[in-house]
Amino acid sequence: MKIVVSGGGTGGHIYPALAFIHEVKKQHPNVDVLYIGTKKGLESTIVPRENIPFHAIDISGLKRSLSFENVKTIVRFIKSVRACKKLLKQYKPDVVLGTGGYVCGPVVYAAAKLGIPTIIHEQNSIPGLTNTFLSRYANKVAICFEETKQYFPQEKVVLTGNPRASEVVGKDGREARRSLGLDEKKKTVLIVGGSRGARPINEAFLQVLHEVEQKPYQCLYVTGDVHYDKVMKAVNDVGNPSNVIIRPFIHNMPEVLAGVDVIVARAGATTLAEITALGIPSILIPSPYVTNNHQEKNARALEKKGAAIVRLESELTGVRLLDDIDRILLNEQTLTNMKEAAFQLGIRDAAERLYRVMVEMIS
């Protein structure tokens, strides 16, 4: 079996693609995989580290306003489609999967025009430009939120969930807690702003850091590499509570997630897939700097089911954040209800579901 996978720009498109590849390799150890991305995207470093053959194409995204850059982008798209057709004819894949980001546009489009079975995977509740365009040509559209159905041709849609969810299931959080110096008997809240951190979340938590010492729970506070030095200077000025562990970055996040009771985070699709798979209640602060405000839409889907509290960045304060944490962690019934609501939303076999969609298409 040969498959081509394409998706990139951000981890939200790359990690679901990698989780899918891991599942296919588990089912078919001898599968041939080719990953197509860009030289500038994160995929150019992440994918080769996984020992997956990588091919880069020259393509950029469309601007949402009228721009001469868009003319150049369309020209590059046409050239990339030609290059992809040539590559696909040589490689002869059985199926092509696109997981979003502008790079998968010419790849999936070229495959569809060549009659190769194609799937696109949409992680967010509101689709991006690339997947909206590709849904006209792809054979199947895999989604993660029921609400997303309305944006795609109904006969093509299948609810699979985010394959990344499957990679956090079954992890043991005890070793991660021990290695971080966390008390195994205390409830734990993880505060994290994504791989680069989030300044507004850092600022809010620092406002109430001195009050956390009195709390019966503990905090694992992940600042993000770029904010760490500034945060530690502020912490040293007020004193670091004994029940707050501060780290710049967490490399073993699946294991860490398995050991926490509540998470304070952005509302990226991968994060939500992971925390619902594990049934972790959340306080979500959607990033306002994303296309279509999709993080707030993602977060509201969890809030609607009672799995999350949503705080917009504009209304976030330290006092409000600490009150929200207390509201969940200091009330056993609230904690239990939110855990159950989150767990019910989780799709733990997402990678296998997407794999089955692929198998049904090519068999």
UniProtKB/Swiss-Prot annotation:
It is an enzyme of class 2 (transferase). Its main location: membrane. It is a peripheral membrane protein. Keywords: Cell cycle, Cell division, Cell membrane, Cell shape, Cell wall biogenesis/degradation, Glycosyltransferase, Membrane, Peptidoglycan synthesis, Transferase. GO terms for cellular component: plasma membrane. SUPFAM superfamilies: UDP-Glycosyltransferase/glycogen phosphorylase. One of its GO terms (biological process) is lipid glycosylation. PANTHER family: GLYCOSYLTRANSFERASE, UDP-N-ACETYLGLUCOSAMINE--N-ACETYLMURAMYL-(PENTAPEPTIDE) PYROPHOSPHORYL-UNDECAPRENOL N-ACETYLGLUCOSAMINE TRANSFERASE 1. Belongs to the glycosyltransferase 28 family. MurG subfamily. This is UDP-N-acetylglucosamine--N-acetylmuramyl-(pentapeptide) pyrophosphoryl-undecaprenol N-acetylglucosamine transferase. It comes from Anoxybacillus flavithermus (strain DSM 21510 / WK1).
